[in-house]
Amino acid sequence: MVNKIPISVKFYGELRDRLPYKKMKAGIPNTLKIEINEFKTVLDLLKEFGIAENEISHIFVNGVYSGAGKIIKDGDRIGIFPKRMGLMFMEITKINSIYTKITFHEELKEFGLKEAIVDLPEGSTLNSILNKYGLSNKRHQIEIIVNGKPIHESDYILKDWDNIAIFSL
């Protein structure tokens, strides 16, 4: 038997209007109190509601800025904001950051420095790196190696001090 855990999810902006649940007045988030299977990530939750990770600006879990790969725990409060609301959070202090080393090979150097150390919110996915460097539309033209292993899933959850190498195919 799979254990279910209760969580609270708030959808803001146009995300709240896409849900089939109760509609709120403008400016008020749509809050859902639901039960989910243990060990799901925020990304799993987004998929269940038909929301793509690239539609999201910011995710907060219990008030802490987080990535889509953050594992949801019993009683978590999750706030999900759309891209259009991104400017509201320009000066967030990133609590619980992870650091990754990214190396761009060959002609991909045009998308950033040859090598960079990047801080990301805990639970960030490979997709967040691709979006950050404008590579999400080139996913099928690049090879991504994380810690020496090829990774083909954009929703791969990054860990602290992962080494990411990006090659052109």
Residue ranges and their predicted role:
Residues M1-L169:
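Ubiquitin-like/PB1-type beta-grasp interaction modules and other compact soluble beta-rich domains
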